[in-house]
Amino acid sequence: DLLRGTAGFDKFREAVSVHFIEVSPALREMQAKTLRCVDVEKTAVKSGFTAPKNVFDDEYRDARGDVSTPFVGEAHTRAKSEINGADVFWHDGLESVPPGPTLVICHEFFDALPVRQFQRTDRGWCEKLITIDSGLSEEGKQREGAEKVVGRDLEMVLSPGPTPASHVLVSRRLKALPKEQADSLRLLELSPPSLALWDRLADHIEKHSGAVLAIDYGEEGPLGNTLEALKDHKFVHILDTPGEADLSAYVDFGGLRQIIEEKPGTGVKCYGPVTQQQLLLSLG
């Protein structure tokens, strides 16, 4: 739609190129078909999503940008779209996107990134964790915040006390809120990979100019417990059939905006969030 909608602007059409950040060979192929790509070039690709390094807490080693993953075959890396003649490229991460003015579209992207959940207790902000069945009595489970799924060996529990993640992430989010609101919160859900990626996108725009549009399920925030699982078009418990359901969580747009507002000396501005209706009406 974006290519068709801008096809009538000759100078824009001649200047634009399309860059997908996509690690799935199957989805790359679908994207190539959607854009009616020809002259396709392929190369070997790795499996798995490599999230940007979490800039807030070095504890998250799974967010490092240099994680080694196995090769799984060939996937699209370059082609040309017959819709408007634009060159199309695929990348494993933002770091390989070339410099230059950039328009970034994040459509239902951030809601698929991992989240961490925290709960205020008399021990402080504890983190919700997933573990094997602890064997606690029902009274003990209730006291420790455990949540068991019948027929499964996994359960959600609370950490014994504050974790490094709660020390860094929770305090950072709460300081942007009015004191009364911050003191009243009992649950908090945050997405470290989303915050880290938004920070990197802001740096890219600051350096090369452009804009980023995020379209997603979400709210101003802060959010509590929005993580949900969908399997066969039905909602299921997130611990039921792990690995077989699609997981998503609402986007904390206020948390993303906070990243921009706290960047020292940045020329990047952040607007919104607004509803999809408001956006479309403003465009006429």
Where are these regions (language model features)?
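SAM cofactor-binding core of SAM-dependent methyltransferases
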Residues: D1-L94
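Class I S-adenosyl-L-methionine
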Residues: E59, D87-G284
